[in-house]
Amino acid sequence: MRLLLLFLSSFLLADSEIFIDQSGANATIKLEQLGSSNLIGGADAVAGSMTSFNLTGTDMTLTINQIGSSNIFRSDAFYSDYVTGLFVFNGDSNQMDILMNSSGAYSADYANYNIEVTGGSNAFDIAVAENSNADYLDLDWIIDGDNNEFDFEIDYENATNYIDLLGDSNEITFSGSGYAGTTSSDAGYFYLDLTGSSNTVDITQASTLARDWLKIESNTSNSTICIVQNDGGTTTSC
């Protein structure tokens, strides 16, 4: 069974809005918005008032393209295994806010998310399976721009997290937790390729068995990088 509620709102000289509520397997969803101050959110929203959209099911392919400035993409209920997601943001002052299986009531395994950002002063807040492992997650970021803020939290094992960042005065805060396996092949792996100046990076890896892996390649000046790896006990923070 598949249920898709999709409402589109587009008026001359007004912002475009997409409200969506999806349940069921094998869904392919592609959404593209061109221009400024556009919204993608939940089916319970009304014009001018945003709620978060719901996606539930397995084997889902989701593509989001927001091309322009001051756009918003928001989801507080993203429950699905075997998801392939491509999120493309090209512009300034955009917002992306996603919770993926935040409560742990479902699962979020075998997901492959690709996030591409071109522009400045964007804000991204992503939490994946805070109370339940997102096993075999593959999360890739490609970022080109200045003054962006990225805050993301993942509870995972058998997973990889890659960031390619080119730009200045960006802020990245990452918190990784979970079981993280017993060998390098099933650990949580984080790789950062950083180029630019005056960037601030805070990384915390706190898996149960301390099998976290971290690699950083940096060509930067006047930047601050803080790394904490901890499987328990008392630690100082960044």
How would you name each of these model-derived features?
Residues 2-12:
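Sec-dependent N-terminal signal peptides
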Residues 15-238:
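Low-complexity repeat regions of mature extracellularly deployed or surface/particle-associated proteins
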